[in-house]
Amino acid sequence: MQKRKLGFAGPHVPIICLGGNVYGWTLSEAETFRQLDMALDAGLNFVDTADVYSRWVPGNKGGESEAIIGKWFAKTGKRKDVILATKVGNEMGEGKAGLKRAYIRQAVEDSLRRLQTEYIDLYQAHKDDIETPLEETLGAFDELVKEGKVRYIGASNYSGARLSEALETSCKHNLASYISLQPHYNLVERQDYESDLLPVVKKYQLGVIPYFSLAAGFLTGKIAANRTRKRPSEERWCKST
């Protein structure tokens, strides 16, 4: 599979990233294992998850996706074959959210335990936390990089202005810097990324890992725009065309 460098200083990764938000949701543990096996056999070894996946499923508490991936690592012994990305900062319940130093320190240990690994290749801020100074957040990430628990850091769901401010903060204080951005971007919804984020991505040479890149399946053709009955999640894409 074709690979390219992730951002200005990241690892070389496949041009496709395998998202794990359905693990523990629409895919069972056994189905997830089969998917991961098939992906690696095809050369797709870039896997992205988050601590919050799949907390929204009734009966789940969060961390299910990470835990299933961790079990797969334990079963196959293929941790070193995978470029592993996960995220921190989204709502996990009981006050567990945000990007304060203390919470990042707690959350990374929880993720490492669930993933059954000693390090995370790409640790991403899942969304901006305007209540926490950027220097505090980036300082916490910098500590994790220096300790070897995290190799690279990235951002997701930031505005262009805040992303630029974060990158300048890292430069000013000599802290670990975001090498990648995970934005909502596809051929249906382009405006926010192209007008606000793309200039920052180009200026700082960030890698981009878009989510909803197929518009939740709409761009595959599986959802007909004129279909009489649509799931609520499908309505948004059909109205955008």
Set out the residue ranges of the language-model regions.
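N-terminal binding-site loop/beta-alpha segment at the start of enzyme catalytic domains
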Residues: 1-81, 146
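Conserved, mostly hydrophobic/aromatic
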Residues: 6, 18, 32, 47, ...
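Charged helix-capping and loop-helix junction motifs
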Residues: 31, 62-68, 101, 105, ...
